[in-house]
Amino acid sequence: MTQGPLTTEAGAPVADNQNSETAGVGGPVLVQDQLLLEKLAHFNRERIPERVVHARGAGAYGTFTLTRDVSRWTRAAFLSEVGKRTETFLRFSTVAGSLGAADAVRDPRGWALKFYTEEGNYDLVGNNTPVFFIKDAIKFPDFIHTQKRDPYTGSQEADNVWDFWGLSPESTHQVTWLFGDRGIPASYRHMNGYGSHTYQWNNEAGEVFWVKYHFKTDQGIKNLTQDEANRLAGEDPDSHQRDLREAIERGDFPTWTVQVQIMPAADAAGYRFNPFDLTKVWPHEDYPPVEIGTLELNRNPENIFAEVEQSIFSPAHFVPGIGPSPDKMLQGRLFAYGDAHRYRVGINADHLPVNRPHATEARTHSRDGFLYDGRHKGAKNYEPNSFGGPVQTDRPLWQPTPVTGVTGDHAAPSHAEDDDFTQAGDLYRLMSEDEKGRLIDNLSGFIAKVSRDDIAERAIGNFRRADEDFGKRLEAAVQALRG
């Protein structure tokens, strides 16, 4: 902000910002005091709707640097040349908590990454876990309702949470991850990020590959125990935000090594489980991660509301050479994110500095709406026309996905190893005895709060189906807590 006298929103100088205008000394306030009315009216409208999920967050700008030639797999321009640097903005978040919630809680962390490429903005909207609780977006509103406050009690209820998870056995893998050591990262800098979904890459020849993104923290994985998190949430609820901001301020820029797993399109139909199932990971022995670049965060936002709260991300923001997969959860998110931001920030949210393309120009025939900035000046607002302006390229961003059968409410195609428990059991068996002990403690402490035996027993039963030892130890721990 430039130096000079205080002004009204219209730019007129303010004579007195300490006293309202009144009818005489001690008299009633006058409606002609437009500064008072302007300040109160603006104050009443400072808040916009918070995100229905991922409300609590922090963000920073940075740079993605390509370190490997991947042109054999994708024609995306920002992935076309070793050493190429692309500006980014990354927003971290928790999922269930409101805008004023604490950072140090047991909850997945959102990982929303915007690449400002010369072909438009590419948004990769994932989490700090490679899997999720459900595999079809039609269940997402129901799932989130269980994570939020109960409409009667006004609190998050253990009954609701475990009732849904128990009746949705596909959640077993993600819940095992969440209640393990990585369920509460020590900071945003000390956790990995994942695209989670499967995405399409396509090259200049039109060949298709399915990919999964991994961002491995170079700071090392650090986590909090439940007791440490409880203390920190009370003493410093802004701990994650503060840690990220202060690290960048002192020049300790956090970095991540970027990897992708790559599956030739021909492998998908015959793979041992559905490769588009968001509740499963691709084993590294089947598709080893390929290192392709580095991500560095090196600049803090100057205004949290303008750049973090008003930032928008959508999994539908693709660039040439990258596209969606048949992942049913991803397909729902392609609509939901844009719709949420149009409601929350407005139809012209893409015009805000943090959201608009930085390395190219958006050229559309869309016009007007709240806070339209007049960027198109007098250009024609329709196409085709006889006066010039942007026209279509006739080249899709991604390759079409072959389909068979008829329309209907179908489950995903069946594969030989599509069960909901094997990978949860594999994760449990990878843990050390100490890690298993903490997992059991974390789970049992929450399940013991459930008021109905059938809900608790169903939840425990899912973990037993993942691993017999897992279920037995958890059942004993819950019984001990419940007396």
Swiss-Prot record:
Keywords: Heme, Hydrogen peroxide, Iron, Metal-binding, Oxidoreductase, Peroxidase. Heme binds at residue 337. It comes from Streptomyces venezuelae (strain ATCC 10712 / CBS 650.69 / DSM 40230 / JCM 4526 / NBRC 13096 / PD 04745). One of its GO terms (molecular function) is metal ion binding. Belongs to the catalase family. The lineage of its organism: Bacteria, Bacillati, Actinomycetota, Actinomycetes, Kitasatosporales. It is an enzyme of class 1 (oxidoreductase). This is Bromoperoxidase-catalase. Its EC number is 1.11.1.-. InterPro entries: Catalase (IPR018028), Catalase_3 (IPR040333), Catalase_AS (IPR024708), Catalase_clade1/3 (IPR024711), Catalase_core (IPR011614), Catalase_haem_BS (IPR002226), Catalase_immune_responsive (IPR010582), Catalase_sf (IPR020835). The active site is at 54, 127. One of its GO terms (biological process) is hydrogen peroxide catabolic process. One of its GO terms (cellular component) is cytoplasm.
